Amino acid sequence: MRYLPWLLLWAFLQVWGQSEAQQKNYTFRCLQMSSFANRSWSRTDSVVWLGDLQTHRWSNDSATISFTKPWSQGKLSNQQWEKLQHMFQVYRVSFTRDIQELVKMMSPKEDYPIEIQLSAGCEMYPGNASESFLHVAFQGKYVVRFWGTSWQTVPGAPSWLDLPIKVLNADQGTSATVQMLLNDTCPLFVRGLLEAGKSDLEKQEKPVAWLSSVPSSADGHRQLVCHVSGFYPKPVWVMWMRGDQEQQGTHRGDFLPNADETWYLQATLDVEAGEEAGLACRVKHSSLGGQDIILYWDARQAPVGLIVFIVLIMLVVVGAVVYYIWRRRSAYQDIR
């Protein structure tokens, strides 16, 4: 019992000393896109994401996986990385060959062109807990997953997949390799990435917001647009408000990536002409420290009025100066 206080202190320091990156969930996702136009032409491209950051890419035209971050190798040694990369190189060649054989076997039920997408990786939770996944889509429809120790079709998958799944599950070597990659290699690799990429993963970039409007498809209406850009991480809350009331007609578009790995989002609201008064766009983001951005539509109109006022004042001043000079010249001519 005398060691218990020291054990508790050690545990506390371990938790307290964890970085922010280790105290939130992160999804490590490998995305594979494979196209088969016919029996002699195919290509496979892959990208890898950790949270909102791309860490790797693998073009069909390249024999090796490219790093998109200085820390993309994580804590793996060069030898460990080469071994892992070789495993995927063998997989890519085998995958292409196996799909071509599968199409030959299933013809005429299934024929070219064929599109296959694969999403695999692991979800990392605080405390070193993790959960792996592997999903396969055929012609854009989710059809197969690897669950536990075996391949399974999902509800609604075509019945012709039963035979390939049976063959895959009979290959115990392949199933064991998939389990190892998902349950052991993935969490270990991601922990290294979280440590090596800590500064990038924990960065906070404040959003910039501005307002505009575009014509609406409805007569007598206009569409107000709230633009939000330059923020990281990706989660953000954008809403059109009238006072404290959220405007349920707010439509948020898709997140779009900027070249600097920040994000752009726009929120639109369709309103009747003349009903814009009192509306505001509110933006919440972790980088703002609770100080939300609030842009009032009425305030947007103020600069226009101010510019008109300044122009009118300048015209009056210029007119007065011209009149004064003209009077001076007239008076001078009268003296002469």
Curated annotation (Swiss-Prot):
This protein's assembly is summarised as: Heterodimer with B2M (beta-2-microglobulin). Interacts with MHC II and CD74.
- The name under which this protein is listed is Antigen-presenting glycoprotein CD1d1
Q: In which tissues is it expressed?
A: Expressed on cortical thymocytes, on certain T-cell leukemias, and in various other tissues.
Spell out the note in the miscellaneous section: During protein synthesis and maturation, CD1 family members bind endogenous lipids that are replaced by lipid or glycolipid antigens when the proteins are internalized and pass through endosomes, before trafficking back to the cell surface.
Pfam families, per the entry: C1-set (PF07654), MHC_I_3 (PF16497)
Q: Which cysteines are joined by disulfide bonds?
A: 122-186, 226-281
The record places domain Ig-like at 207-297
Q: Enumerate the glycosylated residues.
A: 25, 38, 60, 128, 183
Q: Identify the residue ranges that face the Cytoplasmic compartment according to the record.
A: 327-336
Single GO term (MF):
T cell receptor binding
Listed GO CC annotations:
early endosome; endosome membrane; external side of plasma membrane; late endosome; lysosomal membrane; lysosome
Q: Which CDD domains match?
A: IgC1_CD1
Function, please?
A: Antigen-presenting protein that binds self and non-self glycolipids and presents them to T-cell receptors on natural killer T-cells.
Q: What is the residue range of the signal peptide feature?
A: 1-21
Membrane-side (Extracellular) residue stretches: 22-305
* Compartments (UniProt record): Cell membrane; Endosome membrane; Lysosome membrane
Modification comment: N-glycosylated.
Q: Which domain of life is it from?
A: Eukaryota
Q: Any idea which UniProt keywords this protein has?
A: Cell membrane, Disulfide bond, Endosome, Glycoprotein, Immunity, Immunoglobulin domain, Innate immunity, Lysosome, Membrane, Signal, Transmembrane, Transmembrane helix
Please give the SMART domains that the UniProt record associates with this protein. Answer: IGc1
